């Protein structure tokens, strides 16, 4: 499922997930007191709204307008302000040094990695969690290998940063999670 209509169909009528990612909650003490956050492939906006509730100015981007509508409704109910952007994540141009926090959950597109690296400010935090190829050993979840992380892929892409947390697991599902801080520029 990669085009907007497929994702719109998936979100249409589906119950919204409102709880933020456990990874974000676990490491919420690392968030800056203020700043800008980008939530890549934000889906129904649960993490965008959570970050806004932590005092960050948030941009949530997703290809599905149905998902973004769920996010708008969740933000409205919780009194949060989020800038919602519908866009093709495989063609998006991210501003350089624009964000203090970037999150990417359940989305893999390796050609986006250089843009994520450039868009995050020095000292900024990256939260990344998605399925690995080990997921193919389980009956549910994504089946397209192109959407699944290779072993240690996140470490290869961001391992030169300060890795604060990394995990690859295959209990109940094949997942990898990374929390990393972009090194501060040395003057």
Regions found by a protein language model. Name each.
Residues 64-66:
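Conserved SAM/SAH-binding beta-strand->alpha-helix loop
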Residues 94-101:
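A short acidic, Gly/Pro-enriched loop at the edge of an enzyme's catalytic core
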Residues 71-72:
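Conserved SAM-binding loop
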Residues 124-131:
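Conserved beta-strand signature within the Rossmann-like core of class I S-adenosyl-L-methionine
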Residues 1-32, 34-43:
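Conserved class I S-adenosyl-L-methionine
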Residues 78-89:
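Conserved SAM-binding strand-loop segment of SAM-dependent methyltransferases
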Residues 108-120:
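A short, conserved alpha-helix within the catalytic core of class I
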């Amino acid at each position: 499922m990669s085009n907007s209509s497929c994702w719109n169909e998936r979100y249409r009528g589906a119950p919204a997930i409102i709880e933020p990612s456990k990874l974000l909650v676990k490491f919420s003490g690392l968030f800056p007191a203020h700043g800008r956050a980008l939530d890549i492939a934000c889906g129904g906006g649960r993490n965008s709204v959570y970050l806004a509730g932590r005092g960050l100015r948030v941009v949530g981007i997703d290809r599905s307008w149905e998902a973004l509508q769920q996010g708008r409704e969740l933000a409205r109910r919780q009194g949060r302000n989020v800038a919602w952007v519908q866009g093709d994540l495989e063609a998006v141009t991210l501003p350089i040094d624009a964000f203090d926090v970037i999150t990417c959950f359940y989305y893999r597109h390796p050609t986006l990695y250089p843009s994520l690296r450039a868009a995050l400010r020095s000292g900024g935090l990256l939260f990344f969690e998605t399925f690995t190829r080990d997921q193919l050993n389980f009956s549910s979840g994504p089946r397209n290998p192109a959407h699944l992380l290779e072993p240690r892929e996140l470490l290869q892409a961001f391992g030169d940063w300060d890795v604060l947390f990394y995990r690859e697991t295959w209990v109940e599902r094949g997942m990898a999670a990374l929390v990393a801080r972009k090194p501060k520029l040395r003057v």
